[in-house]
């Protein structure tokens, strides 16, 4: 009879050892109340500010803990990782601190800002190799490098020592408050943070409900739990790049399947709203994955009322060049941004008529593409409009139809819409 391998769970002693190991490397990040959200939800909302961590994310914890356990021979041969973001920065800094040579594979679309950050943290101890168009391409090249040169691969999440390092976030939270924590919201990507945190809370705060939060466009953990087996997704929306993975780690899946009270998904547009709200109201800058746990609160308004709630803010490595897209997605989610094909009569004054008679006093044209064609009665234009209120949409469409300007509504046509957003 074939024996089933027991599920690995991080031992409390191993996580405590990781915490000692990380002293002087990772900082003990604040656990602080967010006044605005506490008032909004009628709850005590606490942020665990891993966005203030060294390398601006929790990833240094797992990377350094894993690499510090390498043998002298493994350190001498060097390490390899594949990443387009926070894991690469954590590995790079760990290479410098431990004096280990590292090779970091990054896909070609990686923003130059992130490449420069990795260079800054790793200095002379790392080499960066740009390989392939996707993370999977970079990952395959990194694994081949390990096989041919006998180097150690530092996995971003599917590794015991990495999980134990990330679990130290949980130890800190429970040390920083004496209040009973009713809800813990934790972002889920590959599952390193969620598997580590959930194990610590199951051991030390078993009554806490642990909610894993994934982006709607990359529900790899939720899909796997529903299927009762680790399942790779065919495709994902890469927008929430710090949490968009096609397949979670095998170790991480087994732990999270047992430990998480619930896994939910949050629309990318809601995540963008949260990013903007945090910046405008609290001057907090987060990356999309860093906003996941906070974005989930709107889906638990009744459950968390009067409760003590912790949201893990996982990182702040946001690329400033993405600001326009974040604003656009937030407006679309709020039903305030709309795209149309508008039929303009080929005569003088048609545009003025559209602006004066069709648009409302608070409607704003944000996008306009039009080419006049003299051999046609009507010319089609692609028009983007920003509304003051979502209630203004139906009257706007009625005015367009009544005056023969309406051609088509593009927001619900994904094949066309993807070229605009």
Identify the residue ranges that each predicted region occupies:
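PLP-dependent amino-acid enzyme catalytic core
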Residues: 1-421
């Amino acid at each position: 009879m074939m024996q089933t391998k027991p599920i690995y769970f991080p031992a409390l002693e191993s996580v405590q050892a990781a915490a000692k190991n990380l002293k002087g490397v990772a900082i003990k990040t604040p656990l602080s109340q967010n006044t605005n959200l506490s008032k909004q939800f009628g709850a005590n909302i606490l942020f665990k500010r891993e966005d203030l961590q060294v390398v601006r994310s929790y990833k240094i914890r797992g990377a350094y803990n894993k690499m510090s356990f390498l043998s002298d021979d493994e350190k001498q041969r060097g390490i390899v990782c594949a990443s387009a973001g926070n894991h690469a920065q954590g590995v790079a800094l760990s290479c410098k601190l431990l004096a280990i040579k590292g090779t970091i594979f990054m896909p070609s679309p990686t923003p130059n800002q992130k490449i420069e950050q990795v260079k800054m943290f790793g200095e002379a101890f790392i080499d960066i190799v740009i390989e392939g168009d996707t993370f999977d391409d970079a990952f395959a090249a990194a694994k081949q490098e390990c096989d041919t040169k006998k180097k150690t691969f530092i996995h971003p999440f599917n590794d015991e020592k990495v999980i134990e390092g990330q679990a130290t976030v949980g130890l800190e939270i429970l040390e920083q408050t004496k209040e009973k924590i009713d809800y813990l919201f934790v972002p889920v990507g590959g599952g390193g943070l969620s598997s580590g945190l959930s194990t610590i809370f199951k051991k030390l705060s078993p009554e806490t409900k642990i909610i894993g939060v994934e982006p709607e466009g990359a529900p790899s953990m939720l899909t796997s739990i529903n299927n009762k087996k680790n399942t790779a997704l065919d495709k994902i929306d890469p927008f929430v790049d710090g949490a968009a993975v096609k397949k979670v780690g095998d170790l991480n899946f087994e732990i999270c399947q047992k430990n998480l009270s619930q896994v939910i998904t949050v629309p990318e547009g809601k995540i963008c709203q949260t990013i903007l709200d945090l910046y405008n109201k609290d001057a907090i800058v987060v990356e999309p994955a860093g906003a996941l746990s906070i974005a989930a609160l709107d889906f638990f308004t009744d459950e968390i009322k009067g409760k003590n709630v912790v949201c893990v803010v996982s990182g702040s490595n946001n690329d400033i060049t993405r600001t326009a897209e974040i604003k656009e997605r937030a407006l679309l989610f709020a039903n305030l941004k709309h795209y149309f094909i508008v039929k303009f009569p080929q005569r003088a004054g048609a545009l003025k008529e559209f602006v004066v008679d069709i648009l409302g006093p608070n409607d704003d044209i944000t996008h306009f593409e039009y080419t006049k064609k003299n051999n046609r009665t009507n010319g089609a234009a692609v028009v983007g409009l920003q509304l003051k209120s979502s209630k203004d949409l139906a009257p706007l469409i009625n005015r367009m139809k009544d005056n023969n300007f309406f051609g088509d509504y593009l927001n619900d046509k994904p094949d066309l819409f993807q070229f605009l957003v």
